[in-house]
Amino acid sequence: MKTVIQDTADVYFKRKSDGKLVFTAEAQTASFSQAISEEKLRGGIGNKPLYILKSEKEINLTVKNAFFDLEWLAMTQGETIQEETKVKVFDREHGLIVDDTNKVTLKGKPVSDVTFYNKKGLTYKIAVSTDGTYTIPTAFAAAKDKLTAVYQIEKVGRRLAIKASKFSERYEVEYRTIAYNPDTEEVYSDIYIQFPNVSPSGEFEMSLENGNALAPEIKFEALADTDTDEMAVVIEASRDENTAAPVEDTTGSTQSSDLGGTTE
């Protein structure tokens, strides 16, 4: 059946070890490519080509998403995201004005030593104060001077560890896109492409750049199922069995758009 596919795909990732499911409906691209090893068998006078030896079939998947999702990075690491975890992160305060007693007060709550920067770029490090007020040496900054403070604070968030000894696990992957009837331009069927046994690539890049949205990309390599020998399955499922199928020309003739007639 001839149809038109013009969209990307929804993508489902299911971890084989525990069934954890990751889903995206914001994929920018969902592709797969096949490559095989081909070698010519030659013989006879002139060493002419007699046969092509085919082997080593490979299928590689690439999914690029519009949104960042920590689950994607977790897939490349073989690690589980820890929820509601206390972590220490850096914070800073700008424009802190030294008062007449040569003190400054921080709004945040440091959990580590505080480092102050003056207008000359010099630094002054001091232990955490219980009341948030810090006395600044007059040799470092005078009254009315502006300082910047850098320190660590405690937050609660989702934590993903990247360990040297852990690697990605096996997944099942399914693409789902839609196909259109070229005669009516209505949605005719759903196209499913299933990969029952894939391994995510450990390669992952996060490039943070001004003005450009981070579009994470993850790659997989399909492996053969040990029972069925299948690496992938493509399924076309009609949305409605009563939906009119695209009209196919079985006469071998072509219609003339200029004359409205038939040209043999």
Curated annotation (Swiss-Prot):
Residues 1-76 are annotated as: Interaction with Bacillus subtilis DSR2. The keyword Glycoprotein does not apply. One of its GO terms (cellular component) is virus tail, tube. Coiled coil: none annotated. Keywords: Host-virus interaction, Viral genome ejection through host cell envelope, Viral penetration into host cytoplasm, Viral tail protein, Viral tail tube protein, Virion, Virus entry into host cell. Residues 250-264 have a biased composition (Polar residues). Residues 237-264 are annotated as: Disordered. Its main location: virion. The record marks F13, F23, W72, L73, V173, P200, I218 as: Binding to the host DSR2. It is found in: Virion. One of its GO terms (biological process) is symbiont entry into host cell. The keyword Transcription does not apply. Interacts (via N-terminus) as a monomer with Bacillus subtilis defense protein DSR2 (via C-terminus) in a 4:4 DSR2-Tube assembly; this interaction induces a conformation change of the tube protein and activates the NADase activity of DSR2 and leads to an abortive infection. This is Tail tube protein. The lineage of its organism: Viruses, Duplodnaviria, Heunggongvirae, Uroviricota, Caudoviricetes.
